[in-house]
Regions:
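Residue(s) in the substrate-gating loop at a strand-loop-helix junction
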Residues: 22
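Active-site-adjacent segment of SDR/Rossmann-fold oxidoreductases
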Residues: 4, 9, 27, 48-58
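Conserved catalytic-site region of short-chain dehydrogenase/reductase
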Residues: 25-27, 69
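Active-site loop immediately N-terminal to the catalytic Tyr-X3-Lys motif
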Residues: 27-33
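Active-site helix of classical SDR
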Residues: 2, 38-42
Length: 136
């Protein structure tokens, strides 16, 4: 993305590139070696791209989605209809799952920030989730 989009952004003197990763960008789970390496690599890619392009007006940011997204077409298919419905009933009420439209608002905010206060890394997590570093 950066390789293809950055020349146009450099020409304009501005632009935003947002990469999204999962929790595995910070910590790996048992049996997910390749996934953790890829997500961690994406996080580091954002840092190096930011170092390369920020002075040219290009904002590169990494958004970590650290939680279950209320998405029947993805999480629902992965879990199956019954388990997904149970998750919605137990954690989805009161906005306990990440809501896609609210996530989109956050992405929009990051994409339109003034360059004096760019966000370079951001975690999205529902209020009902306990951060992974606080688990007993």
């Amino acid at each position: 993305i950066a390789k293809e989009a950055s020349p146009y952004m450099i020409q304009r003197g501005r632009g935003t590139i947002i990469y999204t990763s999962s929790t595995a960008a910070y910590r790996g789970n048992k049996g997910q070696h390749s996934h953790a390496a890829a997500m961690g690599g994406r996080r580091m890619l954002c840092q190096t791209l930011n170092a390369q392009y920020a002075s040219q007006g290009i904002h590169v940011t990494h958004i970590l989605v650290d939680g279950a997204v209320d998405a029947p077409d993805t999480l629902g298919k992965m879990l199956g209809p019954e388990l997904f419905q149970k998750l919605r009933e137990t954690r989805g009420s009161e906005d306990g799952l990440l809501i896609p439209v609210e996530m989109a608002e956050t992405y929009y905010h990051v994409a339109t920030q003034h360059r004096s206060a760019w966000t370079h890394e951001l975690d999205l997590r529902a209020y009902s989730d306990v951060a992974w570093w606080n688990h007993a």
